[in-house]
Amino acid sequence: MSINLSHLKKLIATMIPILIAQVSTVGMNFMDSTMSGHVSANDLAGVSIGASLFLPIQTTAMGLLTAATPMAAQLMGKKEKESIPMIIRTGLYLALLLSFLFALLYYLLIDTVLEGLSLAPAVSSIAKDYMLALVGAFLFEMLAMPLRSLTDTVGATTISMRLFLLALPVNGLLNYAFIFGKWGAPALGGVGAGIATLLTYVFLVLLFLAVILSHKPFMGRALFSSPESRLFVWKEYMALGIPNALGVFMETSLFGFIIVFITKFGTETIAAHQAALNFSGIIYMIPMSCSMAMTILVGYEVGARRYDLAREYSRLGLLTTLTGAAITITATLLFRQEIISLYSTDPAVIALGSLFLVYCAGWQLFDDIAAPIQGILRGYKDAKVPFFLMLIAYWFVCFPSGLFFDYVLSHGPESYWQCIDLGVGTSALLLIGRLWWIERKVTRD
């Protein structure tokens, strides 16, 4: 395959800012945990529990709202930019609805859920109050999603990158103020991290609004001059967003189930598993960023009916992530002990975590194929079939095989890393087949 350097540069220019914005978000979460841990173990535990309960709700809602990106990208490709404000406006309405539902869930279920976890009273209290702050943060985080889709597709991904980079130090300063009680703020410990997150997302939404309203290409006046939304836009959000959201929930819930089976192997195994899993999550930001870039670039070309260019960007995206995989896999295998030692000094944890990272290397390879293809398919507005393919890979291949490796073959805790490799590998193969079918279909049509 010959490489068009101008298209490769455009891909990199779209992907790198997304990656930097992702790193900024991870940095905010990192500061929440580390600063809370400097107050007390109870504060760290409360924040960790609250964040764990919040994550599946957060990622599922984000999966639903990401439908705005391929919708807007295809409209840009069709030269129907004037239709984009209604897409974004509907996304804002959907964000408000999701925020109301989350607040209702919190009000009805938080006490029952925390009681079921049998936590120490101090930890339970911190987790409850931390999540109350996250109810407010959730509203503004969800409102930021459609606004980001607008700036990413109509403008450039460098805009959201700059805004997230501005939000990162603000989050750090707010954490310092509200966790430790500095500059006249109350010392709230771990709960202060939730307040800081809320205020940071308020700041971020204000930044997005300032950019959109002050730059004519973003059609800020058209976006807010009318409350109009139409049923067909809601239907398209549901058609694209629900499979995305269910796919994200399915994946996060799978890892939640796996940790339940890992716990029987003891504290050191749990620590090793979490360390390796955390590292793999950091590495996953690379293919995930490429996936998001693919949705924008492929969606634009599909909207313009330039299917040959959509196919070219698809190949360039896969080439980019596989090149990155060669580097990250090599580094993971060569420095696996050093990587785990960043998380723990316990020799048993380092030994077992290093073994898990060998499986993580295989996982990285398959993720660097599967994630970009998911983004490509979203660019084609193909969401329902990929969801069912992921359902097969994760819940009909991955999870049962983990139980088989553990309870029948007695592979121990390695069973669940082996099954992840098998599941992600299966998803990569199935998604390759789906992409091949979609590309042939649009060419025939």
Where are the predicted features?
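Transmembrane helical elements of multi-pass membrane transporters/channels
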Residues: 13-32, 133, 137, 167, ...
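Short runs within selected transmembrane alpha-helices of multi-pass transporters and secretion channels
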Residues: 65, 134-152, 160-171, 193-209, ...
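Short alpha-helical transmembrane segments in multi-pass integral membrane proteins
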Residues: 1-15, 72-137, 185-242, 298-363, ...
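Helix-terminus/linker motif at the lipid-water interface of multi-pass membrane proteins
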Residues: 23, 27-45, 114-121, 177-188, ...
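Alpha-helical membrane-inserting segments
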Residues: 24, 28, 32, 36, ...
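N-terminal transmembrane alpha-helices
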Residues: 2-34, 38-39, 52-71, 96-103, ...
